[in-house]
Amino acid sequence: MTEANRILLGVNIDHVATLRQARGTRYPDPLKAALDAEEAGADGITVHLREDRRHIQERDVRVLKEVLQTRMNFEMGVTEEMLAFAELIRPAHACFVPETRQELTTEGGLDVAGQEARIRAAVERLARIGCEVSLFIDAEPQQIEAAARIGAPAVELHTGRYADARTPAETARELARIRDGVEYGLSHGLIVNAGHGLHYHNVEPVAAIPGMHELNIGHAIVAHALFVGFKAAVQEMKLLMVGAASRR
């Protein structure tokens, strides 16, 4: 496989923790899921420590940081609490995401253009500990330009509107937005990733986009794992992605 056809899978294990927190038990263990995902071919593990601690807990992050063989992508709100925690655990990668307490899941991209100074300071702060920051944004030119201006090395394009599209025309339109966003991000020197709402029936067109570096996928894999097991669920997703990327 050439570099142009290579694509990475980041497995988000938040919803393993959601199941655990639903009953306040010690199981299922997100660490076990992470290790199984790595063994099955995941290129990284993504966790989101939310302000309300609805799934992943601080202890999960600390343990994962110590034992992962790949890398941890730490999703976080741009708050003093999370920045201080990131400085403590020193992840290799972090992704800044917008966050509100009432949302079921992240509902849109970060408004980088509307708060450049604040986000620039946060990116620079984590860069000082060797942490590469990506910004979770909508595939809009002004947001991509702002990400490049503030010195973020990477962006993660929000694929929720594509995933939620209800007609073939709407799906095609949203896929084109993502494709244009990847091209525009690359032209600004950014590493371009994507994620949100991707599953086994919609991932291939996104993975096939030239220049797409990594997809972060969680809920679909955790749900499928209930029926086929965690390793098999990860392997199936990776196979779909690699197959699609090979046809670029």
Swiss-Prot record:
Main subcellular location of this protein, as a coarse class: cytoplasm
Residues engaged in binding 3-amino-2-oxopropyl phosphate: 12, 23, 197, 218-219
InterPro entries registered for this protein in UniProt: Aldolase_TIM, PyrdxlP_synth_PdxJ, Pyridoxine-5'_phos_synth
Pathway where this protein functions: Cofactor biosynthesis; pyridoxine 5'-phosphate biosynthesis; pyridoxine 5'-phosphate from D-erythrose 4-phosphate: step 5/5
Positions bound to 1-deoxy-D-xylulose 5-phosphate: 14-15, 50, 55, 105
Highest taxon of source: Bacteria
Localization, UniProt: Cytoplasm
Membrane spanning residue stretches: none
Active site positions: 48 (proton acceptor), 75 (proton acceptor), 196 (proton donor)
GO biological process: pyridoxine biosynthetic process
First-level EC class: transferase
Site positions for Transition state stabilizer: 156
Pfam families cross-referenced by the UniProt entry: PdxJ (PF03740)
Its job: Catalyzes the complicated ring closure reaction between the two acyclic compounds 1-deoxy-D-xylulose-5-phosphate (DXP) and 3-amino-2-oxopropyl phosphate (1-amino-acetone-3-phosphate or AAP) to form pyridoxine 5'-phosphate (PNP) and inorganic phosphate.
Protein name: Pyridoxine 5'-phosphate synthase
Organism name: Azotobacter vinelandii (strain DJ / ATCC BAA-1303)
Gene: pdxJ
